């Protein structure tokens, strides 16, 4: 076990040394022309907005409203030639008064982002109606993503542990879950469908459902999150094929679990290859770690006195928990730094604190249980349940973090601009 941990620490420092310092969060507005709140003497002719990262032309929408809240039709926005971080929209003839522009874009990591700015021509209007468009509430998306991806992560980890545990004389996957397999599969499938429509609704620039029906893959492939949902759906269908060899299901489960790493912040962090590898390892190890705990709880009686399984279980949990913690730490160094986290008042930072507390609690309980088990004592089911509860809290915090901006220099600048917009 000491050799495994030594290799893990070596890998940690090697990967950390390769980490780049240039990172991004979700696309954030860092500048505009005209400036927010500016009073112009004449029509500027176009609106220009600059973001913290490159944008996809098919996933941009700009809506302009006058002081009465009436929408003014604009031509399709275009990217600045040679600079994909800037989007421009030509303005028609405009009367004197105040106008509000709502800009909807999609980050490199697939998250929808909405920004607003106002400007006036000639003079500010005495009263300005609030445009009808509102920012999308991501609460439902977080809940459905937690439930759906939680089922997938636990299902994959459970199957891998049951596959190995069966060699130690413990029940097979189908034996201890029974009809629960079909229920979990159905819930995951329905959850993916709900996630698709919730995500599609959050995109104002394009309809992914329409693009899917028309076979417009050039648009679909611009959204990593949409592609993750589609491929996950296909893999779940393949998992339903009966009477295949065990290796078929093992490979599909690992692919399905690993795929969940490709729908978050990874695409917005440079270098992308390192970010994807870290997230892939993190998701896979968390899946096996949590799956091992659930498997032990479900086969509690069968595991008693089984020394072969105990050795396998302790080694598996030690390696996966160590890798999960190490990859999580490296991702922090790649994405941001401790000073920015401590100085930030962003939701992401508070979620990180909660995740750290939950993981530390899991490790403390695991250490106590391991020491007791090694001495020949029985495991305590109550402590095992608490360890699982803390694990579910950590997963929820992690998924929520993937839906929110994390603190970086660029994100801090965007946050400052956003505050200025509100003043």
Feature-to-residue mapping (PLM):
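Short, surface-exposed alpha-helix to beta-strand junction/turn motifs within ectodomains of secreted
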Residues: 47-75
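Surface-exposed coil/turn segments at beta-strand junctions on protein surfaces, enriched
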Residues: 40-42, 80-82, 94-96
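Detector for glycine-centered tight turns/loop "hinges" at secondary-structure junctions
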Residues: 37, 68-69, 110
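Bacterial N-terminal signal peptides that target proteins for export
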Residues: 1-8
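C-terminal segment of classical bacterial N-terminal signal peptides
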Residues: 14-22, 403
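Polytopic transmembrane helical bundles with strong interfacial aromatic enrichment
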Residues: 28, 57-63, 75, 84-96, ...
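N-terminal edge beta-strand
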Residues: 24-43
């Amino acid at each position: 076990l000491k050799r495994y941990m030594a290799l893990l620490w070596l890998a940690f420092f090697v990967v950390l040394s390769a980490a780049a310092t240039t990172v991004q969060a979700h696309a954030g507005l860092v500048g505009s022309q005209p400036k927010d709140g500016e009073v112009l003497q004449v029509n500027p002719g176009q609106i220009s907005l600059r973001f913290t990262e490159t944008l996809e032309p098919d996933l941009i929408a700009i809506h302009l409203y006058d002081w009465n809240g009436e929408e003014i039709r604009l031509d399709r926005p275009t990217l600045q030639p040679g600079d994909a971080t800037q989007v421009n929209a030509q303005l028609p003839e405009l009367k004197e008064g105040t106008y509000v522009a709502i800009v909807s874009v999609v980050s490199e990591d697939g998250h929808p982002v909405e920004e607003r700015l106002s400007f006036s021509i000639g003079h500010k209007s005495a009263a300005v109606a609030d445009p009808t468009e509102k920012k999308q509430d991501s609460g439902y998306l977080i809940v459905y993503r937690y439930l759906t991806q939680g089922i997938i992560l636990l299902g994959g980890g459970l199957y891998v542990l049951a596959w190995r545990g069966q060699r130690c004389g413990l029940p097979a996957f189908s034996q201890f879950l029974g009809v629960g397999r079909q229920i979990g599969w159905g819930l995951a499938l329905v959850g993916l469908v709900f996630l698709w429509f919730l995500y599609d609704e959050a995109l104002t620039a394009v309809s992914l459902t329409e693009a899917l029906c028309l076979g417009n893959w050039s648009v679909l492939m611009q959204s990593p999150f949409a592609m993750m949902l589609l491929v996950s759906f296909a893999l779940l269908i393949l998992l339903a094929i009966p009477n295949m060899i065990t290796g078929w299901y093992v490979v599909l489960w690992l692919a399905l679990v690993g795929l969940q790493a490709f729908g978050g912040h990874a695409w917005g962090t440079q270098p992308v290859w390192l970010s994807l590898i870290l997230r892939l390892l993190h998701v896979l190890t968390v899946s096996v770690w949590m799956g091992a705990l659930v498997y032990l709880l479900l086969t509690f009686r069968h595991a008693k006195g089984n020394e072969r399984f105990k050795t396998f279980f302790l080694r598996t949990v030690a390696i996966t928990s160590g890798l999960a913690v190490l990859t999580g730490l490296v991702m922090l160094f790649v994405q941001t730094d401790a000073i920015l986290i401590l100085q930030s008042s962003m939701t992401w930072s508070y979620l990180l604190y909660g995740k750290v507390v939950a993981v530390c609690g899991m490790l403390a309980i695991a250490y106590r249980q391991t020491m007791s088990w090694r001495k020949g004592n029985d495991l305590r089911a109550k402590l095992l349940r608490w360890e699982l509860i803390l694990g579910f809290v950590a997963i929820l915090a992690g998924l929520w973090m993937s839906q929110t901006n994390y603190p970086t220099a660029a994100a801090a600048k965007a946050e400052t601009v956003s505050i200025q917009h509100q003043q």
